[in-house]
């Protein structure tokens, strides 16, 4: 990347280093409401940055599903997923540790391995992070290290279930952002589907294109917008770090005088080796001031501002602040604009949430929706790990958390929803499982209260001062991180999920989805050398039953969207079954069914109310019910049912009852 000369950097970043009063004033401007729908959005601005995972950036943010997740995945060792094994025959582990920007050069570390995951057996247990990525994979930042981004999340909406599209590098993930696929769904199963494939011209200047490069043949979303008459543009400088994938498609190569090239390949000229995004910000600000911003804008940052691990987050924060300041300079434009900040992939940085994957073969599980275009080399290839994503707009103010599952195709689907231009490259499985971002907004009654976002003055100076410090390292005395305390408002979600089990020779799991969007359930068997994991995808309004083969003794965990969790422990067949359904008021109704010939004494423990255990007797060939109101806990529940005659038997049920109304984040995370 460009050498970070202190004098040149401070001069180039001066326009982005302090957040002017204009932005703070603009944050109080209400949305330009005409219809109270998504049609009020006139501009969508998309900034995709580089190579950061969600936990790495925002795992300490209050309320999100981060380091204080009360129900994390358990590894084969029996330890929570945060205890990542070193491997090599030892029992040593690496815990998440802080990338302290005050005492180390954590803002500028070498990029870690972030290649295509390739082997299912290597990654299926989510425990290969340290052996493959090195201990630096477990590094994370806090509010003290990236204060602008934490403040942005406090002021607007953060998405804590937004995933990369591919468990792999930048190239295929950016192809998903610009075309809805990395090729498989378009019947182009070349290496670009999972690897970085380009012609080596890592700049915007088409003069550097290699004529012998085999251009990708499928249609991009900008081409569809162009055909539909929706205005669009890519903002980039000469140095774009090779992050504009349009350069790999035939319509954007060769003659640069056509409309597609003028919008998709043109660049803002400037001193290539000394750019920190100031030229791009100035050109963007000019279009905003002149009310000539297109309906859809993609912003591609120069190398130094890209936030790739060698590129300091503080420069990225200053760059993002510059874009937002430009938008705020014209309040009329701000009032009708959506700004989406996301990251293409996680580099090699750890995230504790296993990504949803489709069952592309029977031994992976089952799906009610087709999984065509979702397999590469015999392995399910999406989704990837979680990455940071924030929605900044007058319709998303208030410090909200949105926990609907998204990926990069969700950005296109938001554009589909607003402009009516459909992208056929998005697979049925992704359309079922990932949302369209609309749940992150309140178009009808947006929050008009003013919000506070700090400036970025001093951050870049701190980064320059840390350049000579040591690289961060795993501390001698390790301890688990804790998130900042407190709950956050949570957006209404489209999930209404249930699961029941029937244990005989196998464990039969029945998944019921009465919500309005699909859900992917991941089933894990505890212990070493166990079968699985399995994935079950259930479309909205459907039910799916699948068998899981286990030993006589079983210990299964089921993870689904928005904290949905079930745990099943026992030995041999069980005549006791439990059904849990949401009631009309957002509470939970438990029905304990005894199909055996003897009464069963059980106890129900409430994880949110320790000591309030409820003893019940379930009569032979009968049932009992227990109703749990949800209002006092924001409709969260965590119940454990045990039976007196079988000490090893357990059914744990946890999650959230979505009511279609705003709620709060999980109290156990607070």
Where are these predicted regions, by residue range?
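N-terminal pro-sequences and low-complexity stem/linker regions of secreted or lumenal proteins
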Residues: 2-670
